Regions:
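Active-site-proximal catalytic alpha-helix in oxidoreductases
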Residues: 6-34, 38-52
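NAD(P)-dependent Rossmann-like dehydrogenase/reductase catalytic/cofactor-binding core
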Residues: 33, 42-163
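Rossmann-like flavin
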Residues: 1-2
């Protein structure tokens, strides 16, 4: 049992927000996403937005897969030292993972099923909007996943070029 249930839950949401939609939109596997500069940078920025919303809501976020929440947020805001540390941690995690690891949202897209995007990137964006915290990447990620669900577009790494 934890006295910090909401902080731990939001921290889990941060991990999901930085990975699931991005893999669904790009079609990339977990290691492709985390080891390549462009998707990794988008992932870190998605996390940063989610962390700032959680902090503004008063949640005490916990370390996520060896990454301090504040350091991860700063990495997404361009702090070079924080970014170097986060890139190292993501690389360590990728080396422990199989190359065919695929987040559940990407699997849902592959199978033509509706995703939980409204409860991940969409939820971050909604809560951010309610408290005046901008979450443009989470908003865009949610919209892209929904467009893919409706078969308006196909998953592709090119979809994150404008991020």
């Amino acid at each position: 049992v934890t006295p910090n249930l909401w902080g731990e839950r939001w921290s889990k949401l941060v991990i999901n927000a930085m990975r699931n939609g991005l893999s669904a939109v790009t079609g990339l596997y977990g290691n492709e996403r985390d080891l390549n500069e462009r998707p990794r940078w988008v992932s870190i920025r998605l996390a940063s937005e989610a962390i700032r919303v959680g902090q503004a809501l008063g949640f005490e976020l916990v370390p996520m897969q060896g990454m301090d929440p504040e350091q991860l947020a700063l990495a997404g805001e361009g702090d070079r030292d924080s970014l170097a540390h986060v890139v190292e941690k993501l690389g360590e995690a990728a080396r422990k993972r199989r190359d065919d690891q695929r987040p559940s949202m990407a699997q849902d897209i592959d199978r033509g099923r509706r995703t939980e995007t409204d409860f991940i990137n969409g939820f971050v964006a909604k809560k951010g909007g309610e408290i005046g915290i901008a979450t443009p990447l989470n908003e865009k990620m949610n919209a892209l996943v929904k467009s893919i669900e409706r078969n308006e577009i196909k998953p592709s790494p090119l979809l994150i070029e404008g991020f």
